Amino acid sequence: MTQTADAEKQVLVPLTTPEEVDQFLQDYPLAAVFKAGTCHKTMQGFGVLETFLQEHELPVGFIRVVDWRPASNHVAEMTGIVHHSPQLMIFKDGQVQFEVNNWDITPEVLEPVFAQVPARSTSGSVQTDDNIEPYRRLMRDFVDGKVSDWAFQDQYVTMFRDDASLRSQREFELLSRLFGDPDAYHGGLHQLGQPQERGELKDRVQQLLTELG
């Protein structure tokens, strides 16, 4: 397996063990490791990364830190960098060159880093196994009158807050459109205000369903 031959299809690789981490970094002299956590910060951070992967050749290994703890610990030990999630590290010849984590994974931070990463000959896309069907089901139930405004808001915000999927930036932005950043509401869900205060909720939900496809 070589970086030149397989860069197009080997974009996103699960790293479940320390051995897989070592093999991945050996196979790909220039590569990134993304540690995925258990909340929407992971979804947001990966969405930012995904926008750069569309235009740049950078294989990414991802670690779900709760499920694959030995792999995560191995990365922390080999780099000497304190673990965070989400966390993005870029390696060259097995040595970490760059690290950023949590809400600091932003376009402004990544842009100068990716200026040093080879560009793709054509725009690419990152395929993941995550889907948006749970959101679709909840939204359909709301539009069909099976769920009240308040219950829908409660369930949707909870689902979004706990969503650690590796999503595209487009999906993240669409899903966050209804109620914004749930981190603003840790003092209690009542701080969200009335479900209808951003406009007719059912109309906005139906529009979102249409855009999600």
Range-by-range predicted roles:
Residues M1-P29:
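N-terminal leader/targeting and pre-domain segments
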Residues P14, T51, V66-P70, V117-S123, ...:
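Terminal leader/tail segments of proteins
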Residues E19-H56:
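Local sequence-structure signature of Cys/Sec-based thiol-disulfide redox active-site neighborhoods
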Residues E20-V21, P107-G213:
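Acidic, Ser/Pro/Thr-rich low-complexity regulatory regions
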Residues F34, E57-H74:
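Thiol-based oxidoreductase modules, predominantly thioredoxin-like and allied folds used
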Residues M43-F46, S72-N73, W103:
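Conserved strand-to-helix beginnings and helix N-cap segments that scaffold or border functional pockets
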Residues M78-V82, N131:
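Short loop/turn motifs at secondary-structure junctions and domain boundaries
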Residues H84, M89-S123:
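Non-catalytic, surface beta->alpha helical segment in thiol-disulfide oxidoreductase systems
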